[in-house]
């Protein structure tokens, strides 16, 4: 499949999801892996999605902050919220893949502090009338006037995926939604998100916090059909899509190495075994099965891991479009209605 063909398929996915009542369409920002990173510009994704959907909310999950000047993020976000007519969800991330940073001459060491600074700047930029001045640890501005302001006031909903306790404390205080990946053991991080929820409520925000959970999903008519189809797609995903990188490293094994370096043996163990579908299914780390089974899996995982937003990856590996669209349709018609009334917190 060429990049152009993949984009056309993506638009067909989004149209189907919009018609079925999906809430969000997010994109990650990845770079420099021809097998996988075909959407290096979240802003372009949002622009394309805006003209093809009517109800879904879209956004980056998120802009890799150290690769940008914060003013650029604020300007892009303001324009996108207008293009989307108030449907932007603005995600910011610090970035975890060192490969992205070198060609951009970006600061990997201070990435977390840069992301936190950008969060403060964006909120101030969108709430300031007239010229803006800002004094941050990395960026300083005097008399900057944004020519476009977002439709949503005071700003679009903000997201920052994190499992760091100190960062989560900041996000709860600032009213920023969060989330994490299936590679992170749910039972290990649940206490941190419980504290995040407590702090959010204590801060008195008028909205409810969203905690997202990124996970691979395949739904078919029966469990046996789903597992049989998913096995090949998952294998291709983790050996080809997240497979050999430019430096010769194997994607999922390098993820395991990164988790180990950060002192996270639980994440390293999941990453090392991600290529094994049986391992994932036994631990409920992939939602594969009939609509009834997938519904039960999601509810159990959400109760354990304290998430209320499923960031589902349906386009897995080299999945056939017929299977992809069937999975999306079954999820939208039979799983989604069952989840509407389910509240894990």
Model-derived features with residue positions:
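N-terminal beta1-alpha1-beta2 module of alpha/beta enzyme domains
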Residues: 1-52, 56-57, 153-156
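Conserved, mostly hydrophobic/aromatic
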Residues: 29, 49, 80, 122, ...
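Glycine-rich, proline-tolerant flexible connector loops at the mouths of alpha/beta enzymes
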Residues: 24-48, 64, 96, 184-186, ...
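Hydrophobic faces of well-ordered beta-strands that scaffold small-molecule active sites
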Residues: 25-27, 58-60, 88-92, 158-161, ...
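Flexible, glycine-rich active-site loops centered on histidine and acidic residues
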Residues: 1-5, 66-134, 178, 184-186, ...
């Amino acid at each position: 499949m060429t990049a152009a063909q993949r984009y056309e398929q993506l638009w067909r996915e989004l149209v189907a999801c919009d018609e079925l009542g999906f809430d969000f369409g997010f994109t990650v920002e990845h770079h420099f892996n021809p097998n996988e990173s075909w959407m290096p510009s979240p802003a372009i994704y949002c622009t394309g999605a805006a003209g093809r959907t009517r109800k879904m909310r879209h956004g980056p999950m998120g802009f890799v902050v150290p690769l940008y000047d914060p003013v650029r993020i604020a300007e892009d976000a303001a324009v996108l919220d207008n293009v989307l007519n108030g449907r932007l969800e603005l995600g910011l991330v610090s970035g975890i893949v060192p490969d992205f940073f070198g060609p951009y001459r970006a600061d990997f060491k201070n990435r977390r502090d840069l992301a936190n600074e950008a969060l403060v700047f964006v909120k101030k930029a969108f709430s300031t009338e007239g010229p803006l001045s800002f004094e941050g640890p990395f960026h300083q501005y005097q008399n900057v006037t944004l020519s476009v302001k977002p439709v949503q006031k005071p700003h679009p909903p903000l997201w920052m995926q994190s499992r760091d306790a100190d960062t989560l404390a900041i996000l709860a205080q600032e009213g920023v939604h969060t989330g994490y990946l299936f590679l992170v053991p749910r039972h290990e991080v649940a206490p941190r998100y419980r504290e995040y929820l407590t702090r959010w409520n204590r801060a008195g925000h008028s909205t409810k916090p969203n905690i997202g959970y990124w996970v691979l999903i395949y739904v078919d008519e029966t469990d046996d059909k789903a597992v049989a189809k998913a096995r090949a797609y998952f294998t291709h995903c983790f050996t080809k899509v997240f497979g050999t990188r430019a430096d010769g490293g194997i994607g999922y094994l390098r993820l395991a190495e990164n988790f180990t370096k950060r002192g996270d043996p639980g994440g390293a163990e999941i990453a090392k075994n991600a290529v094994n579908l049986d391992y994932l299914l036994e631990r409920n780390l992939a939602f594969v099965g009939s609509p009834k089974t997938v519904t039960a899996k999601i509810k159990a995982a959400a109760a354990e891991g304290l998430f209320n937003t499923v960031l589902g990856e349906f386009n897995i590996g080299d999945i056939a479009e017929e299977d992809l669209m069937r999975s999306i349709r079954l999820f939208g018609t039979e799983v989604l209605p069952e989840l509407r009334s389910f509240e894990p917190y």
